[in-house]
Amino acid sequence: MTFKKYKPVNASQRHLILLNRSFLKKVPLIKSKIVGLLNSSGRNNQGKITVRHKGGGIKHKYRFINFKINIISIGIITSLEYDPNRTAFIASVYDILKKNYIYILALSNLKIGDIIQSGNNTLVKLGHTLYFKDIPVGSFISCISEKHSAIAKFSRSAGTYSTLIKKTRNYCQIKLSSGKYKIVSNSGFATIGIVSNENNFLKILAKAGRSRWLNKRPSVRGVAMNPIDHPHGGGEGKTSGGKSSVTPWGKPTKNKKTSTSNNKLN
């Protein structure tokens, strides 16, 4: 994928680097899978902030993506599109057996006209969705479901993938992009391949306004706050903190694990 670099005619374009999305379809193909989206901006049903640094953002609509496996399905890629709700691109697929259209996450190197399949007795091939019992060890997989009845929850961001490390009779172990190991059921499923838009992390927004378009608000340092707002706050003039780095709620942020992992597969 190529990049778009702009001439520095003003400060906001001096360091701007964006991805070239000219190959994507401009108009959504499946209008029935698109609905209006009400932005809650990191608030819960009481209006309280549960996720900080969220708010604003430009209006956009939600695309319904198929994150479930079809028992038997054969489809053809009809278009590649941009989705404002995620970093990866999406692909519209025409299901030959059910004679309808669905959206899926686009994979790297997946092209318009490619045939994809899902279900039992499916070949191990780019874009095909298989159960873990049919996937060979060492495969790069994405859109991972922990069990048959669940939707895909892991490796859905741009450029992410997991690796199938080990298989037993009922369970298998996968390594996520974060390096964490996860145990999932053999009845779960995954898609062969790496999620599209793998160069997304290289783009440079170059101005605060682009972050605000993406629903991102500024992140204020703890030492710049008052003592009531953060453990690092307060003091006359500028202070260096004078204590170990902690979260606004007092939990240590460095040199100490705050979670335990029992994902050991013997």
Model-predicted regions and their roles:
Residues T87-D95, K99-L105:
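Glycine-rich active-site/cofactor-binding loop and its immediate structural neighborhood
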Residues M1-R86, D95, S108-N266:
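Basic, glycine/proline-rich low-complexity segments that contact nucleic acids
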